[in-house]
Amino acid sequence: MESKIRNYYAVKVTGGQEVSVGLMLEERAKTNNIPEIYSIIVPPGLKGYVIVEASGPHVVKLLIAGIRHVRGIAQGLVPKDHIVKMVSKKVTGPTIKEGDLVEVVSGPFRGMQAQVVKVTEGKGEVVLNILESAFPLQVTIPVDQVKPVKKT
């Protein structure tokens, strides 16, 4: 048996409707039992497009026919390395180390200064010692809720 050819096609959609169109395409692929659709990707940073992994453009045209907010298929194929870049997790933001002085930017401790006691990178959390409290107070909050004030 031949190996299935998998190509990525960009489907043009109305801006802001990417998630709803992606869900409608998924539902249609399931109800119409279209096995040539392998995946439907809604890239977070790409406005106005939904990526469909399929065996050919005729399958994608069959899938998108009559769906609201779909404007057509973009010409050509999307290279696989572009897809990997779009969906891979990007490490952003400043790195915070133990002993750094930080300010809490959201949550119940917003605006308070704290010292970093421990950083758990796997969970994306930091354990802080709040400096502005009357007694020693340690809290664990997500790393995106703090910003560095002073490095040690």
From Swiss-Prot:
Keyword tags: Transcription, Transcription regulation
Sections of the chain in a coiled coil: none
GO molecular function: structural constituent of ribosome; translation elongation factor activity
GO cellular component annotations of the record: ribosome
SMART domains: KOW (SM00739), NGN (SM00738)
InterPro entries given in the database record: KOW, NGN-domain, NGN-like_dom, NGN_dom_sf, Rib_uL2_dom2, Ribosomal_uL24_CS, Spt5_arc, Translation_prot_SH3-like_sf
GO biological process: regulation of DNA-templated transcription; transcription elongation-coupled chromatin remodeling
Cleaved signal peptide residues: none
The KOW domain, residue ranges: 98-127
Subunit structure: Heterodimer composed of Spt4 and Spt5. Interacts with RNA polymerase (RNAP).
Chain's role: Stimulates transcription elongation.
Homology family: Belongs to the archaeal Spt5 family.
Protein name, UniProt field: Transcription elongation factor Spt5
Organism whose genome encodes this protein: Acidianus ambivalens (Desulfurolobus ambivalens)
Name of the coding gene: spt5
